[in-house]
Amino acid sequence: ILLTHNHADHTGGVKVLCDRYHPECIDNFSQQLSDGQMLKLADLDLSVKVLLTPGHTLEHVCYLVDDKHLFCGDTLFGMGCGRVFTNDFVAMYDSLSKIKALPESTLCYPAHEYTANNLRFITSVDNNHAYYQDYAKYLVMKLTSVQNSLPTVLTDELRYNLFLRCDDPN
């Protein structure tokens, strides 16, 4: 079990799973993980890289699987990012910058589906609504057909997510 951080909505069922199935649990709050550390998962042929991504919480980590699937917990959401409970906005900015540096084809798997609400927020603060129209149409289609917009592609996040564009003067 790969845990991104120590919030109850992420860890609540872990004890039951561990008691029943006895999996290995990997996290950054009961053990020390390091940025860039490669994990070996028993019985799985996967390459998992640890990315330390503090900001939402101090111990938050993301997991990059096979250099193309990012399990980003509450650091990055579709069209948004997690609340900064640490009050360390520089750490969150650095964590988002680390995600921005990944290949644009990276598939991002946030822990929560907040994309539609985040898009409403973005269009309430960014007057350039036309910029988001195509993505909004795509989002409605995807949410209607499969009821989920995830995973999201980093290309779309780099283009539309205000929190990944905060250094853009426009």
What function would you assign to each model-found segment?
Residues 21-22, 75, 125, 167:
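Prokaryotic Sec-type signal peptides and long signal-anchor helices
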Residues 19-28, 71-73, 130-134:
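Short hydrophobic/aromatic-enriched beta-strand-loop microsegments
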Residues 12-13, 27, 42, 80-82, ...:
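Glycine-centered flexibility motif
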Residues 1-4, 8, 21-23, 106, ...:
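Intrinsic structural disorder
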Residues 31-126:
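Catalytic core of the metallo-beta-lactamase
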Residues 97-107, 116-170:
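Accessory terminal helices/loops
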Residues 28, 34, 76-79, 149, ...:
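Residue-level signal for pocket-adjacent positions within structured domains
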Residues 1-49:
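Active-site HxH/HxHxD metal-binding segment of metal-dependent hydrolases
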